[in-house]
Swiss-Prot record:
Xref: SUPFAM superfamilies: Ribulose-phoshate binding barrel
EC number(s) given by UniProt: 4.1.1.48
Gene coding for it: trpC
Keyword Lyase in record: yes
The protein's name in its UniProt record: Indole-3-glycerol phosphate synthase
Keywords annotated in UniProt: Amino-acid biosynthesis, Aromatic amino acid biosynthesis, Decarboxylase, Lyase, Tryptophan biosynthesis
């Protein structure tokens, strides 16, 4: 019997989590909370408008830990990090809410979003419509759908639920087959290419460059993972990729927002980003 991959273990846990959460808070109650949540801030539109100007459209990630790296940031105050990112020029935020594998929390999303005016994506492993409604109830503006974790029917169902509650969708792919499935099944303009293989956690920027010619021009290609220095950013710009999701490079820096500036807006680096206490 083969050993389950990290992704397979995470997905199995998510089904358990949905059962546990829905026993505590009903879907009907979540739907009520979703209707009273703050209006969505336009996650997709913010990225598209920035990328149209050929300026870096950065989704800056708030992430305490990961399965492959363990704890990434010891001093972890989501609201402070969010403010630092906003000052540093982020277009959107990504907040990990997975508890078991990334040491995330729903409260982190709420704290980060309350501290800034930026749109926020709930970064988690979506397997059930319950989680989508829950994301809107928490105040999220967008959800992530990972193609390798979903079949086409479930992917379409989750996207339809997102649309119903007013959430944008970022669909994430890692290879050509997943890209083909995503383009066929969903009409979201946001196509994220994860340079990290979620089964092995190996990273290669070639993943984005290989898939880029197959992403239609009316979709926005977002490169995710493995952007560590200016050379990586410039490589993407040469290939007309202006949208990025970056987490670890920022989380390891003393001042995440200043690191964002250094990486994406070096000409603007000044003493404007306050140190985190």
């Amino acid at each position: 019997m083969s050993v389950p991959t990290v992704l397979e273990r995470i997905i199995a846990r998510k089904f358990q989590e949905v059962a546990e959460r829905s026993a505590r808070v009903s879907l009907a109650e979540l739907e009520r909370l979703a209707k009273t949540a703050d209006a969505p801030r336009g996650f997709a539109n913010a990225l598209i408008e920035q990328a149209k100007r050929k300026q870096p459209a950065v989704i800056a990630e708030i992430k305490k830990a990961s399965p492959s790296k363990g704890v990434i940031r010891e001093h972890f105050v989501p609201a402070e990090i969010a403010v630092s990112y906003e000052k540093g020029g982020a277009t959107c935020l990504s907040v990990l809410t997975d508890v078991d594998y990334f040491q995330g929390a729903d409260e982190y999303l709420q704290q980060a979003r309350a501290a800034v005016s930026l749109p926020v994506i709930r970064k988690d492993f979506m397997v059930d419509p319950y989680q989508i409604v829950e994301a809107r109830a928490l105040g999220a503006d967008c959800v992530l759908l990972i193609v390798s974790a979903l079949d086409d029917v479930k992917m379409a169902e989750l996207a339809a639920t997102a649309k119903d509650v007013g959430l944008d969708v970022l669909v994430e792919v890692h290879d050509g087959d997943e890209l083909e499935r995503a383009l066929k099944t969903l009409d979201t303009p946001l196509v994220g290419v994860n340079n990290r293989n979620l089964h092995t956690f190996e990273v290669s920027l070639e993943t984005t460059l290989d898939l880029l010619p197959r992403i239609p021009r009316d979709r926005l290609a977002i490169t995710e993972s493995g952007i560590l220095n200016r050379a990586d950013v410039e490589l993407m710009a040469i290939n007309e990729v202006y949208s990025f999701l970056v987490g670890e490079a920022f989380m390891r820096a003393e001042q995440p927002g200043l690191e964002l500036q250094r990486l994406f807006f070096p000409e603007q680096v000044k003493k404007t980003v306050q140190p985190l206490d």
